[in-house]
Amino acid sequence: IREHLEALGYYVFAKVLNALDYGVPQKRERIIIVGFLEPVLFAFPDPIPINKRKTLTDILEKDVAAKYYVKDSIKESRLSRLKDKNYPKPYISHENMAGSITPHPYSSALRAGASANYILINDERRPTEREMLRIQGFPDTFKIVVPYGKMKHQCGNSVAVPVIKAVAEQMMLSLNI
């Protein structure tokens, strides 16, 4: 990609950025490619301080409808395979392809399609539509107008908003805008 952009006359900068470093409780590493038609001084944004980042506690809803909770059999199965039985709540657990369950204080990257990396909050329930949006850094003013499955797909395909905002701000600085 870089070679093609440079062949078209762009000055290209590329770096892997993690959404965790820009304020959302999601480990989502993505390569970000920025190109300019003129030579400019550009630097990717620095990560924000840890104490300014949102945590799961910040984004989780307090009252969640019963439809988001999993069957007792799923909950019991996951809890029996949980690696750390004393992990403090709230956590998001991730089931890998081997069936191992690992809790984390952040989400793995949300996925658009089927994935072995099935996430549950406290091994009890699926994230709500609003929580998925918050994990991606969308403001609460963002309207939910599609069903759960489509929202999950859209959030899985999205980039983390704070990452792109920070990169865009750096681009504007480089262009003196």
Positions of PLM-derived features:
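S-adenosyl-L-methionine-dependent DNA methyltransferase catalytic core
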Residues: 4-16, 21, 26-177
